[in-house]
């Protein structure tokens, strides 16, 4: 049976850059908040003491997040500047198309359209500076809203979002495919879709 710490760690991992609140952790795991505080402190200490771990646990704006340690910033930057990450996969393009057409949109909104979890795709697009955070939705948990950036426009040779074809609301039986088709028409992308 998995330990409480393992459960917490898995939720921190899957919540990605958005992070997770103490209330959300408590609701999902059934662990009371005082016990969660204790487990989170232990987990933070574990990462801090373990020199072989690349991660650290941070607490900001009522949310807990797993992030890479500052000492690895140059290595991460080197990877991000390599050709390996600049080519967008089908899953990344799909996520980007949804954000481009539906912005501002939450990660959960993207997940619902894609039908799969999108945390890693959103993190990747943020690292590429193609999308950015744009406030929070006034709803329980105050989820982060995402929008495209000026770099997104430059990347695809667009002058403004107005150059994206308009959605035909009457024909949107498969919203995800319509968004991808329109996005590919505009950007000239023909990459095969792939699952995250």
Curated annotation (Swiss-Prot):
Keywords: Cell cycle, Cell division, Chromosome partition, Cytoplasm. Disulfide bonds: none annotated. One of its GO terms (cellular component) is cytoplasm. GO terms for biological process: cell division; chromosome separation; DNA replication. SUPFAM superfamilies: Winged helix' DNA-binding domain. It comes from the Bacteria. HAMAP family: ScpB. PANTHER family: SEGREGATION AND CONDENSATION PROTEIN B. Homodimer. Homodimerization may be required to stabilize the binding of ScpA to the Smc head domains. Component of a cohesin-like complex composed of ScpA, ScpB and the Smc homodimer, in which ScpA and ScpB bind to the head domain of Smc. The presence of the three proteins is required for the association of the complex with DNA. Belongs to the ScpB family. This is Segregation and condensation protein B.
């Amino acid at each position: 049976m998995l330990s409480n710490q393992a459960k917490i760690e898995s939720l921190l991992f899957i919540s990605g850059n958005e992070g997770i609140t103490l209330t959300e952790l408590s609701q999902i795991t059934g662990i009371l908040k005082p016990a969660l505080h204790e487990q989170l402190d232990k987990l933070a200490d574990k990462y801090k003491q373990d020199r072989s771990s690349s991660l650290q646990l941070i607490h900001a704006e009522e949310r807990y997040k797993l992030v890479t340690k500052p000492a690895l910033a140059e290595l991460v930057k080197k990877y991000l500047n390599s050709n390996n990450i600049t080519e967008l996969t089908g899953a990344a393009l799909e996520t980007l198309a949804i954000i481009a057409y539906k912005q501002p949109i939450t990660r959960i909104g993207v997940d619902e359209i894609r039908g799969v979890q999108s945390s890693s795709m959103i993190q990747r697009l943020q690292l590429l500076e193609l999308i950015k955070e744009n406030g929070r939705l006034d709803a329980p948990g105050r989820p982060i809203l995402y929008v495209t950036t000026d770099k997104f426009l430059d990347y695809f040779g667009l002058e403004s979002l107005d150059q994206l074809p308009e959605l035909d609301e009457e024909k949107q039986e498969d919203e995800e495919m319509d968004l991808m088709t329109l996005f590919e028409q505009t950007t000239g992308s023909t990459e095969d879709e792939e699952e995250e």
